[in-house]
Amino acid sequence: MNKLSAVVLMLVACRTAAAVIEPTAPNAVDHVHGRAPLQLAIFSSHVEDIARQKGVSFAEAAAKVRTAGISGITVMDGLAADRIAAARNAGLAVACVVGWPEFEKGYDEAKCEALVSLAVSNGCHQVMLVPGFYPSAAEDAALFDVIVRRTRRFAAMAATRGVETLVEDFDDERSPTCGIRRTKAFLEAAPSVGFVYDTGNFNSPGERAESGLELLPRARHFHLKDRPAGDCRGSCAVGSGVVPIARIVSAARDAGYGGWFTIEHFGATNMLECVKASAAFLRAL
């Protein structure tokens, strides 16, 4: 072997090794599937669960989540600033902020502005609201109008600061966005508000998880929640239950969606293992 051949072989070997160890850029194209990898996030309360279950600090739990392939965190309102900083230091971008403004009771301007400021100060452009509740499962047309009007007011304020306002199909029969019919009505009444598609929350009679696909044009974020067979309220790792997660994610990507997918399994007693399994399943799609 001459010197030139040896140099060429060395360069090839170095490039091959670099390709193996170089981390994938967030928006890099997966040349096997021809698509960018999914942007996966986790709820901040799930990180807290991991810390408690594993007996480690929040920062250590966030690092474990990042190692599992998660790159974002959906922050619940009230999370301490030092924990948000720890998550960001671990490499988790703030994907969304979730707030509970209780619009059925009134419009707290300071609280609403603080929610938006929390997002802006952490480089986040989405706030999801659980806007309010009816007194019971019965619909209340007058209260619906009040909650919608205050949600639109919030959305107008947030938009001036570059933040989108979102609502999800919420799994509480007292919610004005429970089920596909109520969610559609709410979004029609609030055209400036985006939709968070929670794959595990379409549980009303006659509904299927795919019901939300008709709202795909309004989707700005996804909560990927799976359900165990025979338990419409249970929690399990994404991909291990009966919800057609792969089909829904594929439909979203085919429609051009390239935003965040927050994995969700509230109540899991083995949260880190669920996170790892969910991330592995989703990365393989």
Outline where the language-model segments fall:
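C-terminal helical cap(s) of enzyme catalytic domains, especially alpha/beta-barrels
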Residues: 271-285
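Active-site beta-loop-alpha junctions enriched in small/polar residues
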Residues: 43-47, 76-78, 99-103, 132-134, ...
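N-terminal pre-domain/capping segments
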Residues: 20-125, 194, 283-284
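Alpha-helix-loop-beta-strand connector modules within alpha/beta enzyme cores
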Residues: 86-101, 148-158, 186-190, 245-248
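Active-site groove signature of glycoside hydrolases
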Residues: 121-140, 161-172, 262-263
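Structural preference for beta-strand elements that scaffold enzyme active sites
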Residues: 37-41, 72, 93-96, 125-128, ...
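Conserved, mostly hydrophobic/aromatic
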Residues: 65, 87, 119, 165, ...
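Acidic/histidine-rich catalytic cores of soluble enzymes
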Residues: 97, 156-242
